[in-house]
Amino acid sequence: MIPVVALVGRPNVGKSTLFNRLTRTRDALVADFPGLTRDRKYGRAEVEGHEFIIVDTGGIDGTEDGVETRMAGQSLVAIEEADIVLFMVDARAGLMPADEGIAKHLRSREKTTVLVANKTDGLDPDMVTADFYSLGMGEVYPIAASHGRGVTSLLETVLLPFVQDEIEEPVELSEEEENAAYWAALEADEQASEEEAEDDFNPEDLPIKLAIVGRPNVGKSTLTNRILGEERVVVFDMPGTTRDSIYIPMVRDEREYVLIDTAGVRKRGKVTETVEKFSVIKTLQAIEDANVVLLVIDAREGISDQDLSLLGFILNSGRSLVIVVNKWDGLSQEVREQVKETLDLRLGFIDFARIHFISALHGSGVGNLFESVTEAYACATRRVSTAMLTRIMQMASDDHQPPLVRGRRVKLKYAHAGGYNPPIVVIHGNQVKDLPDSYKRYLMNYYRRSLDVMGTPIRIQFKEGENPFADKRNTLTPNQLRKRKRLMSHIKKGK
């Protein structure tokens, strides 16, 4: 399960600045849900190859009324959902009564909490953080989020211990070693592709994890019940690693599925109303754990910014996608045409996803969903050999040559598979990281057409060897030095 990190503190202590600093590693804010939790932001961060979900809980006003009553219900649940809480304070403003109130609340929750003193740039960190030790939160980590100072140390000390995978240090290679590594990697990948037929892994043997997500009241629960009702299976709760989600096994056409329900299919006595409404964290985790995501959209309300934010998170997660437009029944032909035009306009950038128009209430169109689900899963888990990927890369290069970079043509050497669900193509070559985005999109679309991929995004990664002589000046040989000396002497005599 991807760890969840909540940023907590008074207003204007720099939580949003740190949030942007962390999520910028993925080049954007991943998701923004103004309709569910006002002025809250949710994003994905990557620290040395490990992913985290970052939650900006907004400002908490701990006044004389007490933090317990002044804190928004959604923020309370965000803290409960978090694996780590970064409690941020303002080093320039010093210790405030609100900080003490928030600290008291956090201590009562017994959460893993790290005290972060922001805005220490230009100040003596030891001096400005001394007062905060009285909060009893342990070590104080001074940072300057706006400049990034101290953030790396904070991440390495606080976040990385939550992941167990060891990170290998990069090894510098000489030019000969780099060339040998290219051919060795190519040979190894070709050998691996030949052994694929003997590989014990078969995606068909595993159940397809299907997450049903969307805004409130778009019909997620109705669709879940319709799917289960049609199949007449015994529904039981199977607890999983993603908290606050219910895993429901089912069988359809002799194919096993696991529905990940994010609509709160639980006993009402075990949850509070606030927890029930706060579905952001469990939705994000359900997406991460799923193989295929059904994004449900209300045909009567159209596509909202919240739908696009959720869609952006799905795409960045690399999950297969099927778009479901619900409540299609009862709409006039004119309204249906308008809805389709809006979908084409706002969802034109995801032309790889199938769109289904259904009525979960009456069941029309629901049965056809599973054709697209199985197609998307098959495309996402299909094994493709190194020889095939390299041949497609060469065909794409022949049809449209890579551009010149600093006067030299970018050279694509070979390609191989780097992962599945989503499919990842790794292209090796010289200066490949300098390719413009337009050519990268061209390669991605070329692979999609050539492999006939539907329902899942394709990711392309570029790798190149470092030139060990890039920063070294050429040294003259003894003969060249003598020749240079004679030329300089001749020039001086001529003057």
Curated annotation (Swiss-Prot):
SUPFAM superfamilies: P-loop containing nucleoside triphosphate hydrolases (SSF52540). The keyword Lipid metabolism does not apply. The keyword Zinc-finger does not apply. GTP 1 binds at residues 9-16, 56-60, 118-121. GO terms for molecular function: GTP binding; ribosome binding. Keywords: GTP-binding, Nucleotide-binding, Repeat, Ribosome biogenesis. GO terms for biological process: ribosome biogenesis. PROSITE patterns: G_ENGA. GTP 2 binds at residues 214-221, 261-265, 326-329. It comes from the Bacteria. Residues 3-166, 208-381 form the EngA-type G domain. Residues 382-466 form the KH-like domain. Belongs to the TRAFAC class TrmE-Era-EngA-EngB-Septin-like GTPase superfamily. EngA (Der) GTPase family. GTPase that plays an essential role in the late steps of ribosome biogenesis. Associates with the 50S ribosomal subunit. This is GTPase Der. It comes from Pectobacterium carotovorum subsp. carotovorum (strain PC1).
